[in-house]
């Protein structure tokens, strides 16, 4: 959904990243040519990395602003070490979870609220807002149909390779630290 609450255009895939950037309000759904992906399979689509694992931004495609990047698996594993029950945010009323990373969860520890945003399926349908969410990582999980992501719902939290590249998930950027390595 766009900020003005109108629905995005849904267009059959595949499409190149360069073409997709020309039309930011389009959602590219799967096609008969590409059942699991809206573009070619490319682990370095959003963030690049050297052979020894140093992460650096692919500024052409990265959805995060300068100084920020998509999370690596370690970022999600660290974040999801401790978390709250599935709750409504006191200010917004949106369902989700509080995450406190390495600190045992409690109301007086540093924490961050991640909302259950739902997702847009490969056919372009909106699904499960306030019930479930997947947050993208920068890590491809091998094969055409797998991307690592932080997943949670009312009774589960997991970092899992169960996401499909063609589905629209939430993006939560993390601070980009120069020279940081993938783990």
Tell where the protein language model's regions lie, with residue ranges.
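Low-complexity, Gly/Ser/Thr/Pro- and Asn/Asp-enriched, turn/coil-prone segments
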Residues: 1-42
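C-terminal, surface-exposed recognition/capping segments
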Residues: 25, 30-183
């Amino acid at each position: 959904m766009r900020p003005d609450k109108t629905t995005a255009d849904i267009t059959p895939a595949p499409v190149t990243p360069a073409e997709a950037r020309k039309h930011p309000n389009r959602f590219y759904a799967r096609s008969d040519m590409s059942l699991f992906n809206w573009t070619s399979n490319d682990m370095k689509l959003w963030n690049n990395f050297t052979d020894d694992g140093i992460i650096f931004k692919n500024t052409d495609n990265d959805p995060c602003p300068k100084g920020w990047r998509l999370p690596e698996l370690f970022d999600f594993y660290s974040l999801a070490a401790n978390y709250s029950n599935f709750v409504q945010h006191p200010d917004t009323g949106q369902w989700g979870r509080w995450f406190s990373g390495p600190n045992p969860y409690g109301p007086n520890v540093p924490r961050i609220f991640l909302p259950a945003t739902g997702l847009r399926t490969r056919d372009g349908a909106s699904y499960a807002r306030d019930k479930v969410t997947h947050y993208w990582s920068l890590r491809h999980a091998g094969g055409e149909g797998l991307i690592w992501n932080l997943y949670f719902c009312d009774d589960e939290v997991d970092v899992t390779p169960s996401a499909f590249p063609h589905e629209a998930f939430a993006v939560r950027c993390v601070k980009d630290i120069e020279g940081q390595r993938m783990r």
